[in-house]
A protein has these predicted regions:
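NAD(P)+-binding Rossmann beta1-loop-alpha1 motif at the extreme N-terminus of oxidoreductases
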Residues: 1-51, 55
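Rossmann-like NAD(P)-binding element
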Residues: 51-80, 84-87, 91
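Internal alpha-helical scaffold of NAD(P)-dependent oxidoreductase catalytic cores
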Residues: 130-214
Length: 276
């Protein structure tokens, strides 16, 4: 199989390594020429993905920012083979699916939204690894839910990555859930570390501090674009969180032991309910 990959950051680079190790021919498009050459020297990429080589790809993976992925596909759709499968790997789904589903239908190829639920606080090809997706969930957003053959095709095409579980959903449901499970933790972590007290944490911090601040180290431009594309759901989740924080803050300010205990009990019970 020949696989074309747009973008060689953490996700695209890890995909390239996984497919190369599995013996597939990997072509890549990367604006940073030095990074592309490094990926070739590392054996993760075997050639360039461009207008001349798009047509040889059986599978194309879009691994750059959402707007850029859709722009690239709109510009190059005429070169995509009709029997090719195109999967985007962006963190939000509504806008890219809105643009790319009709595009694929018009040109005769197949487009599926995808979101690998794996990553790192680090970005870039140098942090990529073939095992990044091993055992991790993969979310698929197909054009139709009743196309079992397409879902099987996606699973087979993504087999070299070693995903442990596949979930199928709509673009709307995906973005609503991702606002809570992914975007909110990144915002909270990034805001938390801005406390002036953080400068003196060494010697006073352990697991809880590390857990909460790990994803504060993020790619600012990428995450800003993701947040803005999903601002309705993310703002809604932020409003809920701010309201909850206010309740804790007010109970503390009033020295209200009973209310504070109740709030903590509610949070503990909710954790047990959602995670068992």
């Amino acid at each position: 199989m020949t696989v074309g990959i747009l973008g060689l950051g953490l996700i695209g680079g890890s995909m390239a390594r996984a497919y190369a190790i599995a013996g597939h021919n990997v072509l890549a498009c990367e604006k940073d020429e030095q990074m592309l050459q490094f990926a070739m020297l590392a054996g993760a990429v075997h050639g360039k993905l461009n207008k001349e080589t798009i047509s040889v790809c059986d599978l194309i993976l879009l691994a750059i920012y959402p707007g850029g992925s859709a722009d690239w596909l709109e510009e190059n759709a005429c070169f995509v083979r009709k029997d090719a499968l195109v999967i985007d790997l962006c963190g939000v789904k509504r806008e890219i699916c809105r643009r790319c589903f009709p595009l694929a239908e018009s040109y005769g190829f197949t487009f599926v939204g995808g979101h690998p639920m794996a990553g790192s606080q680090f970005s870039g090809f140098k942090y990529s690894r073939a095992e990044l997706f091993r055992g991790q969930p993969m979310v698929l957003v197909p054009p139709r839910f009743d196309d079992i053959a397409l879902l099987d095709r996606c699973k087979q095409a993504l087999e070299p990555c070693g995903f442990g579980r596949f979930s199928v959903t709509t673009a709307e449901a995906h973005d609503q859930m991702i606002a809570f499970t992914s975007q909110m933790p990144h915002i909270l972590s990034n805001a938390f570390i801005k406390s002036p007290t953080a400068s003196n944490h060494k010697g006073f911090s352990a697991g809880s501090y590390k857990d909460l601040t790990r994803v504060a180290w993020l790619n600012p431009r990428m995450w800003a674009e993701l947040f803005l594309e999903n601002k309705d759901y993310t703002v809604s989740e932020l409003d809920i969180y701010i309201e909850n924080l206010r309740a804790y803050r007010d109970a503390l300010a009033r020295d209200d032991l009973q209310t504070l205990t109740t709030l903590l009990e509610e949070g503990k019970r909710r954790k047990e309910e959602v995670d068992g």
